[in-house]
Amino acid sequence: MQSRATQHHLTRWVGIAVTTTLAAGLAGCASAEPEAGAAPQTLVLVTHDSFNLSEGVLEKFTSETGITVQVQAAGDAGELVNKLVLTKDSPLGDVVFGIDNTFASRAVNEGVLADYASADLTEAEAEYLLPEGSGREQLTPIDNGDVCINVDHEWFADNNIVEPVTLDDLIKPEYQDLLVVPAANSSSPGLAFLLATIAAYGDDGWQSYWANLVDNGVKISGGWSDAYYVDFSGPSSEGDRPLVVSYASSPPFEVPEGETEAPTGALLDTCFRQTEYAGVIAGTDYPAEAAQLVDFLFSVDVQNDIPESMYVFPVNSAATLPEGWANYAEIADDPYVIEPDDIDANREEWLTQWASIATP
């Protein structure tokens, strides 16, 4: 993975070392479940607006435990964490899903999460764990995906223009007025793209890169839905911009019925790796049952449903991908990453600087 650049040089992210003691370390992540009183009739799952599972999936948890799951949406990943922080003295629910690696450290540092991480993880899922002290003890990885530039192949073929490949290409004159991105201060994919540019160009270079993007006519939309479904020229939209920030897993859902070729694709040299987590909310009256729900979200019953319900990859190595994903949905071999603690320490300053450049 490509880490944050220092003095314009890309370094490589080593990741979390997997040692012979990993299995014990994973088991140690799970806190001892406190004794519970009377089991609840309902658990509240606080999540982002994009949460979706097929009909009947959450009912499997109910059939196993007798507990109904009430889903409460709370905005995107950033809004979700903000609301958890603002209500930590009177928690919104029992379990949270949708905190990603760009906001994990803030949630941990603000004390909104109880010490529980599922013991069901194996060495195969170790790459998705957060560092110790930055969420490993409180957050269980559930899904992941790469936020990348998506390209409308048909548009470029019709206009006889070679498709871009890298971030550097996006500021070239031939791609003027072709890119739309969600705002970094109001969209999780938008923030992920900003972080990709920070990782690529470093503290001294990303601001100039964004100034060049603005000069080259980048359009800033309010959120991912507007960027993808309104401004993008792909088949799901009526827009006129053939380049958009989306996910590497978006192209499979653009394949027309009966066809074998995806009309869009992801530029895998532009990607930022995003992982979403679930955790027990501190202050829940039902910590043991909340822990069961976290384990259920990691279970194959949920993991097999995630790709076609939320358009991202499951992290459970035992999960099965839908037919077609192997052909159209890709994961970048070398995505950009920034350590969660680094994001937490600099996020607000980066967003302030970004806003002064991108939305003057």
Question: Over which residues does each language-model region extend?
Answer:
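C-terminal motif of bacterial Sec signal peptides marking the signal peptidase cleavage site
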Residues: 24-28
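Early extracytoplasmic/lumenal segment of secretory-pathway proteins
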Residues: 30-32, 36-106, 236
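A structural signal for short loop-to-beta-strand junctions that line the ligand-binding cleft
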Residues: 91-96, 114-151, 168, 178-184
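Periplasmic solute-binding protein
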Residues: 101-112, 133-162, 190-200, 275-279
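Short beta-strand->loop
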Residues: 113-122, 139, 168, 248, ...
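A bilobed periplasmic-binding-protein/Venus flytrap-type ligand-binding module shared by bacterial periplasmic
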Residues: 150-155, 274-289, 297, 305-309
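Periplasmic-binding protein-like
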Residues: 175-185, 297-321
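Ligand-binding pocket segment of bilobal, Venus flytrap-like solute-binding proteins
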Residues: 189, 195-269
